[in-house]
Each structure stands twice: as structure tokens, then as C-alpha cells.
From Swiss-Prot:
Species classification: Archaea, Methanobacteriati, Methanobacteriota, Archaeoglobi, Archaeoglobales
Function statement: Phosphatase that hydrolyzes non-canonical purine nucleotides such as XTP and ITP to their respective diphosphate derivatives. Probably excludes non-canonical purines from DNA/RNA precursor pool, thus preventing their incorporation into DNA/RNA and avoiding chromosomal lesions.
Cofactor annotation: Mg(2+); Mn(2+)
Keywords: Hydrolase, Magnesium, Manganese, Metal-binding, Nucleotide metabolism, Nucleotide-binding
The protein's name in its UniProt record: Probable inosine/xanthosine triphosphatase
Length: 169
């Protein structure tokens, strides 16, 4: 796993445990060319690079997860946040998205000035290291959805071609 973030690791574990036995997730720090606060295609590229850089022939799969803002019409701020997962088996890389949601206008305004979502949301929520705990989505959804949930869903979506190999030849 191309991250040591506990919410991402746990989400990936839950996704893989839906389909595989004896799942072990090893988190490793990797660097990517994506900026600290990615937008649009930078988010997808960051997830792919995390998965590929975390890969070792000792692993069956590696995973990269990256959250970022995507431009979108019909939103208050013009942006939605999506968590993107990439799963890599040494040959094939697949992508999955989690559910998208919108940050408050004041958060997006600060991000567009160069701050990271996590930094702004810590101030808004008063919760230190929010992104490594339950995530901003947990705070904004009043506890209904956690960052672990978003990670699980995005990794599950990325696993679809692997769990249906005969359909994705």
C-alpha cells in the first residue's frame, strides 16, 4: 500500500477481505509527482504512482489511494472531492472511484489559495490529524461516512476487473 495512513490501510484491508482470505496490508511511504493537494487528473496519476511504487514481486497486489478535487458543474463551489484507488498486480493497473462530496465554500476558497484540504478542515472541525483519523467526510456527514468507508469503496471499485478476470481479458 502506497501510504501509511491508517484510514487508507484499513479501507483497503476491508475491500480485499471481501474477496480474498489471509489479507495482509503493508503500508509504505512513497513519493508521487502529484502535488500535496491534487486536482482532477493529478489525483488519478497520484493513485497510480502510489500503487506502482509500492509494488514488490513479493506482493499479489499493491494499492494507491489519492483524494483530490475534481471540477464539476451543478455544485456550490465548482468542485467535488473524490477518493481514487489504483490496484496493481505487476502487469495490470485498474482504477476505482469512491463517492464524491462537496466541501463548504470556505474550504474550497482556501484550497484554491494554496492550502491543503486537511489543513483547512482541521481548523474548521477543531480535530487535529482529521485525515488520519475519520476524515473530513466523517465530520461533514455527521458520522455517517468515514474516510475508511471511502477507501474501501474506491478499492472495491478498482478490484472489479481482478475479481472478474474472465470478463476483462
Amino acid at each position: 500500500m502506497g501510504s501509511k495512513n491508517p484510514t487508507k490501510i484499513e479501507g483497503a484491508r476491508r475491500a480485499f477481505e471481501q474477496y480474498f482470505d489471509d489479507v495482509e496490508i503493508v503500508g509504505v511511504e512513497v513519493s508521487t509527482s502529484a502535488p500535496p493537494q491534487p486536482f482532477d487528473a493529478e489525483t488519478v496519476r497520484g493513485a497510480i504512482e502510489r500503487a506502482k511504487k509500492a509494488y514488490s514481486p513479493d506482493f499479489d497486489f499493491s494499492v494507491g489511494i489519492e483524494a483530490g478535487l475534481f471540477r464539476s458543474e451543478c455544485t456550490i463551489t465548482g468542485y467535488l472531492d473524490f477518493q481514487v484507488a489504483a490496484v496493481y498486480d505487476g502487469e495490470r493497473c485498474t482504477i476505482g472511484f469512491g463517492p464524491g462530496f462537496e466541501y463548504p465554500k470556505l474550504v474550497v476558497e482556501e484550497v484554491l489559495k494554496g492550502k491543503e484540504v486537511g489543513e483547512v478542515m482541521e481548523k474548521v472541525s477543531g480535530i487535529k490529524n482529521l485525515g488520519k483519523k475519520v476524515g473530513a467526510v466523517h465530520y461533514l456527514s455527521k458520522g455517517a461516512i468515514s474516510r475508511t468507508d471511502l477507501s474501501r469503496i474506491s478499492v472495491t471499485m478498482a478490484l472489479i476487473p481482478f475479481i472478474n478476470r474472465e470478463m476483462y481479458l
